[in-house]
């Protein structure tokens, strides 16, 4: 496994509570997120209770503290984070929702994060109930499918099929840490 205390870089695909908790466990890390996501969670968008419900105030405060500790870096739009890791601004689920393409032994794997929660969202253009902008979310499904190319290279953020489709990174981590460079079945 990886010791969180030794992690240097963390990419935050968005700032919902289920994705930014436990930032304190990474004391040496520099964090990266879309600039528009930080603007959204610290600005006018949060005056709307509906938009605010997916964020915990203490998490937002922790993100702002990282800015003041010079441990937050902002990116905008699409680009390359490091060789073999590209980021894509998708939006929809949150204002700054992004996804990643990571090169693996079997080819580029598209990590959708919450741009796609479940395969059925993309298959049926079925919007997820937690969203910032439905039209952007629906268009994002098409963008994600295009960027992934083959469905077997698409990894939605919360679909149980993912844990059934990829092996554990090592014994004892089944369902928790997966080896996305290998696929057990064609999804």
Show which residues each predicted segment covers:
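Metallo-beta-lactamase
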Residues: 1-2, 6-8, 36-89, 135-151
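A hydrophobic, small-residue-rich beta->alpha segment in the mid-to-C-terminal subdomain
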Residues: 112-140
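Conserved small/polar residues in nucleotide/adenosyl-binding loops
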Residues: 185-187
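Residue-level marker for buried hydrophobic side chains located in beta-strands
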Residues: 11, 109-111, 155
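Catalytic core of the metallo-beta-lactamase
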Residues: 5, 25, 67-119
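Active-site gating loops and adjacent loop-to-helix segments of metal-dependent hydrolytic enzymes
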Residues: 115-125, 170-181
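Active-site metal-binding motif and surrounding structural segment of the metallo-beta-lactamase
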Residues: 1-33
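Active-site metal-binding loops of divalent metal-dependent hydrolases
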Residues: 15, 36-37, 92-94, 113-115, ...
């Amino acid at each position: 496994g990886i010791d969180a205390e030794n992690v240097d870089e963390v990419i935050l695909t968005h700032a919902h509570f289920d994705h930014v908790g436990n930032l304190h466990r990474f004391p040496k890390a520099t964090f990266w997120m879309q600039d528009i996501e930080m603007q959204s969670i610290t600005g006018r968008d949060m005056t709307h209770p509906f938009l605010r419900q997916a964020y915990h105030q203490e998490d937002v405060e922790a993100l702002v503290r990282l800015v003041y500790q010079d441990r937050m870096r902002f990116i905008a739009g699409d680009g390359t984070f490091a060789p073999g890791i590209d980021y894509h601004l998708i939006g929809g689920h949150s204002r700054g929702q992004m996804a990643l393409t990571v090169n693996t032994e079997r080819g580029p794997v598209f990590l959708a994060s919450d741009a796609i929660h479940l395969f059925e969202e993309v298959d049926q253009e079925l919007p997820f109930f937690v969203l910032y902008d439905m039209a952007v979310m629906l268009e994002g499904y098409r963008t994600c499918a295009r960027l992934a190319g083959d469905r077997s290279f698409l990894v939605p953020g919360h679909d149980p099929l993912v844990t059934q489709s990829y092996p554990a990174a090592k014994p004892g981590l089944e369902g928790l840490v997966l080896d996305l460079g290998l696929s057990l079945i064609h999804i």
